[in-house]
Amino acid sequence: MPDYDLIAILGPTASGKTPFAAALAAELNTEIISADSRQIYRGMDLGTGKDLEDYTINGRQIPYHLIDIADPGYKYNVFEYQRDFLTAYETIKQKGCLPVLCGGTGLYLESVLKGYRLIPVPENQELRVRLAEKSLEELTAILSSYKTLHNSTDVDTVKRAIRAIEIEEYYAKTPIEEREFPQLNSLIIGVDIDRELRREKITRRLKQRLDDGMVEEVRRLLAEGIQPDDLIYYGLEYKYLTLYAIGKMTYDEMFTGLETAIHQFAKRQMTWFRGMERRGFTIHWVDASLPMEEKINFVKQKLKEF
């Protein structure tokens, strides 16, 4: 095995990156580290698209890390992700394996691939008051003016956007010291799915997850005492399904709004990954529609080329 420290599999939602990563991990006899900002929560399964059955290949369970590690309602952040990633990474490396990082949360991916440690950012009440009356569109415009690392792909609520700006303001005014974080030599593989196929898969998967009980999952979380605002904070499925569950939306409004939001989210993910390329990352793109064996051979060939 060449001197790569990590293989990263990234792609938009519904691109098939998880089955690909699991099949690759089975082939290389290794383990997966998730890079998904919502799959870290226990009990939030259908709404985050965990699809844990994808980690079973030919009857063999592929070990995965950083899924189901926090309770719903908790505000897990990128600083904790870096810490937990390193723990998982070192655990896998100690077994003599090449870890596979897989996910679609741009901030989490880039925070470990870029190789510098982020530091916790305190709340700025004065800034929060100043931004409180602004719309999500206005806040997104402010956020896009910053050049540093914040993941606008996951900013789909006012609360998240304000927190994102708070982080950017803090970094803009705080000298960035050299921070200890391993410089990982990573082979980055992007799963490129045709736009129309992606849209079709998103809609089909949304209908399937609703049939499987996604509304009931949200109602259960609410019944367990998770506050509606906390679920709405997680965005996408949890935002729309919570608004439906508490009577603020009809079923049709929920479905149409959520379907549109997921399509927009996937588009923003691709914009983020293209931005990574502009920021100096080399992403080797593989066609999502290729047979699994061909995709795995593509990665193995890239490993040999190193």
Swiss-Prot record:
Ranges in a coiled coil: none
Record: residues binding ATP: G11, P12, T13, A14, S15, G16, K17, T18
Site entry (Interaction with substrate tRNA), positions: T105
Disulfide bridge partners, by residue number: none
Protein name: tRNA dimethylallyltransferase 2
One example of a Gene Ontology biological process annotation: tRNA modification
Catalyzed chemical reaction(s): adenosine(37) in tRNA + dimethylallyl diphosphate = N(6)-dimethylallyladenosine(37) in tRNA + diphosphate
Classification via PANTHER family: TRNA DIMETHYLALLYLTRANSFERASE
Obligatory cofactor(s): Mg(2+)
Subunit-structure text: Monomer.
Single GO MF annotation: ATP binding
Functional note: Catalyzes the transfer of a dimethylallyl group onto the adenine at position 37 in tRNAs that read codons beginning with uridine, leading to the formation of N6-(dimethylallyl)adenosine (i(6)A).
EC number per UniProt: 2.5.1.75
Natural source organism: Bacteroides fragilis (strain ATCC 25285 / DSM 2151 / CCUG 4856 / JCM 11019 / LMG 10263 / NCTC 9343 / Onslow / VPI 2553 / EN-2)
Family: Belongs to the IPP transferase family.
UniProt keyword list: ATP-binding, Magnesium, Nucleotide-binding, Transferase, tRNA processing
Top-level taxon of origin: Bacteria
Presence of keyword Transferase: yes
Annotated positions binding substrate: T13, A14, S15, G16, K17, T18
Sequence segments annotated as region (Interaction with substrate tRNA): 36-39
InterPro entries: Dimethylallyltransferase, IPT, P-loop_NTPase
